[in-house]
């Protein structure tokens, strides 16, 4: 209920528009297009499933599938040998217990998305540790409410 005032307090600007042309989507779907301070833009599609449950179904133009019920890492990287091993090694060294993990890619050798849902919190240094691999382009951390709030 306070979303608008919180957004204003944090300096976020927003615009709502409707799209009546896309008739193949779930009726409770929202597409969010974001521009970061560094100018990078990306979009996220989410669906309200009812009962307080949501599903994220797209990031940029890649179909994904995760619930937001767990703390989540979204890692955008090049589809190259060893990147996934680097990510899981970092998480293992930080004692992060993976609940669900999915990898999506645009095309072989191009951009890939690793979606990692896990139990508990994320050590403070973990995002910077994952960035140490030169093929990692972006790391976003979405904490579950009540966990550490180091968000992206």
Question: Where on the chain are the PLM-derived regions?
Answer:
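A conserved regulatory-domain signal marking ACT and ACT-like small-molecule sensing domains
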Residues: 1-152
